């Protein structure tokens, strides 16, 4: 048993070490160029190095551990940065705005993906990534819908690139349409952008009050992650049971929630009721953020340039169309609910 663990650890270390180095460099570059962000640097450095200097199979176990296990741990610890009480801060209209916007984003993203000829599971991954919280949402949904690794890595890459573009674009829109009004600007950025880092980076163009309130809107979306995973898990189970019934078998599949989603929910509840001390919560948040960047480096290293060239242009069109739809939906809903 001990020898097996040592052997497994040795096989993981080379790839994990490269992902760690990429993550450290990406964090440094992200602070130097906050408009781009560490996540985008990590993914693209990973893609470049994984297809040039570090193509060897000896890095596979480490990159697989980074992109799967570290992302799962990141999702669990992310719960410490959330507080269910934040929902009350926005009131009914704010929560209703987020719920409707997320629903429209999921349905529209899935519809566009299928119309463009993408597979059902890739379209579901894009739906979750754009509607909820980018890489973490895709990582959460991927196992419950049994998505292919190639779909997962392409979806994460496209969602992060689209988010980076929107991060620059949204402050321009808010300045033109809302004259940088705090509430409306926060609702637009917090309701659309995929990651917390993108929300903060975009909101900083306007000011600290927008950073704080946009983050609250974003947190509500992340809290809804559990609901999205449950719904997607139910969809997958229904599809599997339909196949069994079609072959005259008794349906045997049940909804199974990944352990890290349960962990995320438990940590979120513990943080909301004040059991997790502030310093521990901040530590969890720091670890979660760094694990995610290392995971994104691993995801980048596992992207094959051939797959990216093959799917890239159409996938970027997909991401662009979804981004435009999100902006239209958000502007319309803000006009109704956020005044």
UniProtKB/Swiss-Prot annotation:
GO cellular component entries: plasma membrane
Protein name as it appears in the record: UPF0324 membrane protein CPE0129
Main location: membrane
Family the UniProt entry places it in: Belongs to the UPF0324 family.
Compartmental location: Cell membrane
Membrane topology recorded in Swiss-Prot or TrEMBL: Multi-pass membrane protein
Any matching Pfam family: Cons_hypoth698
Annotated keywords: Cell membrane, Membrane, Transmembrane, Transmembrane helix
Transmembrane segments: 12-30, 35-54, 90-112, 122-144, 156-178, 210-232, 259-281, 316-338
InterPro entries assigned: UPF0324_pro (IPR018383)
């Amino acid at each position: 048993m001990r020898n097996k663990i040592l052997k497994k650890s040795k096989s993981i270390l080379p790839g994990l070490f490269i992902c760690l180095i990429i993550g450290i460099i990406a964090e440094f570059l992200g602070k130097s160029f906050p408009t781009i962000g560490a996540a985008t640097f990590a993914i693209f450095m990973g893609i470049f190095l994984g297809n040039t200097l570090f193509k060897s199979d000896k890095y596979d176990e480490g990159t697989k551990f980074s992109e799967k296990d570290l992302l799962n741990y990141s999702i669990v610890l992310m719960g410490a940065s959330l507080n269910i009480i934040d929902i009350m801060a926005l009131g009914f209209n704010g929560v209703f705005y987020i719920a409707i916007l997320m629903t429209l984003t999921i349905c529209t993203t899935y519809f566009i993906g299928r119309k463009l000829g993408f597979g059902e599971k890739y379209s579901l991954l894009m739906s979750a990534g754009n509607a909820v919280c980018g890489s973490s949402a895709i990582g959460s949904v991927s196992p419950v819908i049994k998505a292919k690794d190639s779909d997962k890595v392409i979806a994460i890459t496209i969602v992060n690139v689209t988010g980076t573009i929107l991060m620059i674009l949204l402050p321009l829109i808010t300045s033109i349409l809302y004259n940088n009004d705090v509430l409306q600007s926060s609702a637009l950025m917090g309701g659309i952008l995929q990651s917390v880092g993108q929300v903060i980076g975009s909101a900083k163009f306007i000011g600290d009050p927008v950073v704080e309130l946009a983050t609250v809107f974003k947190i509500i979306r992340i809290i809804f992650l559990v609901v999205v995973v449950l719904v997607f898990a139910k969809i997958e189970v229904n599809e599997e049971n339909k196949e069994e019934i079609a072959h005259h078998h008794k349906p045997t599949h049940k909804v199974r929630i990944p352990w890290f989603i349960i962990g995320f929910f438990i940590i979120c509840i513990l943080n909301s009721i004040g059991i997790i001390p502030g310093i521990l919560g901040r530590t969890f948040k720091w670890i979660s953020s760094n694990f995610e960047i290392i995971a994104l480096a691993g995801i980048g290293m596992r992207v094959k340039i051939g797959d990216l060239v093959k799917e890239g242009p159409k996938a970027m069109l997909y991401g662009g169309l979804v981004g435009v739809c999100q902006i239209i939906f958000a502007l319309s809903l803000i006009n109704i609910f956020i005044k």
